[in-house]
């Protein structure tokens, strides 16, 4: 998968498989279970203490459109007070994602109003919180994905994609069902952010473009003159030759190498 951190050494999970006439049960080493009902097909996930965490809606567990390749699954909500958080940067007023229809498809949306979706990030991962207990769900799919978090029906939530596989991971949160454990397990699967260099933690001056070169130098000099800490200055798109990437507008920036060298000597990236 594109999303996994393959640099980690992983142990083969210790999974016990049991079966009855009606279902197949997969149990991990900590006691969490995936219970697969054979007919009609449905899946439910149980915590280490036996509590149902995620459960298919038996009327609509999985949908696959052979003509378009679209896939989706629908889960029952424990109640309307089960609250959802996550999905990365979104243009909603509320932290809660309850009642939202969320699309993951990176989009460069300029000057977007509140409620616009999709925008810049696609993170198909969320937390669910109910009675102080948490679980997490990550949908491992690179196609355009969507999450209906109770918008269509408050009794259920649905997620799917325009194609690909219905490949998702449920994080139980351990015996304590804690958000910390959910995040640890998600990060162990997908990777952790490397420790950034010291300069990246400093003040970074950014806006929609500083140009020409004289203006950039003026900004840098102003920070130093006024003793305002700053480590980075962003140029944005107006340094380019007619907005073509990997080019410089030689009228606005006649000697970019010299400018960058001088800024570096003055402590700017």
What do the predicted segments below correspond to?
Residues 1-190, 196-199, 206-208, 215, ...:
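N-terminal accessory segment at the very beginning of proteins
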Residues 197-201, 228-231, 266-269:
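Short, well-ordered coil/turn segments that N-cap beta-strands
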Residues 234-269:
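Acidic/aromatic-lined carbohydrate-recognition and catalytic surfaces
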